[in-house]
C-alpha cells in the first residue's frame, strides 16, 4: 500500500497567501473606517464650535454609525443627544403661539383672500411647551370649536438618528416640522405612520400643510 504523502510546501503556500490577503484586506478596510469616522467626528466638532448645530448633528450621526463601539462612536452619540435637545428648544421657542392654517401651499403660492371665502371657519393650532391644541373659529360668529388636544411628543426612529423636529400624534402619524427664518411660517409634512407592525415611511404624495403665525 502506498503511504499518504504529506502536503508539500508548494501546496501550503497558496492557502497561506489567500488567508494573508483576506486578513490584510480586513485590516485595511477597518483602518479606512476608523480614518473616515475620525474625519467626520473632527468636522462635526468644528461645526459644533461654530454653533452650526444642524450640520454638526448630521456629521455626528454619520460618525456614530460607522463604528458605534469605539470611543469616537460613543462620544458622537452623546453629542447627538445634546444637540437634539438644543435644536428642539430652539424650534419650540419659534413655534410657541397660535398658527392659522392656510392650506397645502405656502403663502406665496396662492391668493389667500380668494381661498378664504370658500370656508365658513378657519383652522388653527395653538402650541405650548407640552401640548398642541387644534381648533376651528367661525368667521362670522368668531365662535371657537376645539377639535382635539395632542401631547407634544418628539419622534425618534433610533437614538443615533439626526431627526430633531419630527413629532408623533396619538393616531400614530409622524410629522416633520420646519419654521422659516422670520418665525412666521410653519410647514408640516406627514413623513410616516407608526402601527403595530412598525413604522410605515411615506416617501411620495405626502400630506403637507402650511400655517402662518397670528399670535
Feature-to-residue mapping (PLM):
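Alpha-helical protein-protein interaction scaffolds
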Residues: 29-88
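Short consensus segments that form the blades of beta-propeller domains
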Residues: 113-116, 199-201
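N-terminal helix-cap/turn-to-beta initiation motif at the start of protein domains
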Residues: 84-100
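Short, surface-exposed charged micro-motifs
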Residues: 122-124
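Edge beta-strand at a domain terminus
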Residues: 189-215
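Contiguous, well-ordered beta-strand patches that form the walls/edges
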Residues: 34, 104-113, 129-196
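Bacterial Sec-dependent N-terminal signal peptides
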Residues: 1-33
Amino acid at each position: 500500500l502506498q503511504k499518504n504523502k504529506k502536503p508539500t510546501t508548494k501546496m501550503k503556500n497558496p492557502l497561506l497567501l489567500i488567508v494573508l490577503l483576506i486578513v490584510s484586506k480586513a485590516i485595511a478596510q477597518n483602518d479606512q473606517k476608523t480614518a473616515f469616522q475620525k474625519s467626520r467626528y473632527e468636522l462635526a466638532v468644528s461645526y459644533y464650535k461654530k454653533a452650526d448645530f444642524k450640520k454638526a448633528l448630521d456629521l455626528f450621526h454619520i460618525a456614530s454609525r460607522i463604528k458605534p463601539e469605539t470611543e469616537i462612536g460613543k462620544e458622537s452619540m452623546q453629542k447627538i443627544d445634546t444637540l437634539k435637545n438644543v435644536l428642539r428648544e430652539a424650534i419650540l421657542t419659534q413655534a410657541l403661539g397660535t398658527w392659522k392654517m392656510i392650506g397645502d401651499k405656502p403663502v406665496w403660492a396662492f391668493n389667500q383672500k380668494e381661498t378664504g371665502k370658500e370656508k365658513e371657519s378657519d383652522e388653527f393650532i395653538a402650541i405650548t411647551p407640552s401640548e398642541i391644541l387644534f381648533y376651528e373659529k367661525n368667521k362670522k360668529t368668531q365662535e371657537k370649536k376645539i377639535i382635539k388636544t395632542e401631547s407634544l411628543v418628539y419622534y425618534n426612529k433610533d437614538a443615533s438618528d439626526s431627526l430633531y423636529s419630527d413629532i408623533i400624534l396619538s393616531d400614530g402619524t409622524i410629522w416633520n416640522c420646519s419654521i422659516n427664518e422670520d418665525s412666521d411660517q410653519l410647514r408640516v409634512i406627514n413623513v410616516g405612520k407608526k402601527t403595530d407592525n412598525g413604522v410605515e415611511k411615506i416617501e411620495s404624495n405626502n400630506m403637507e400643510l402650511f400655517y402662518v403665525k397670528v399670535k
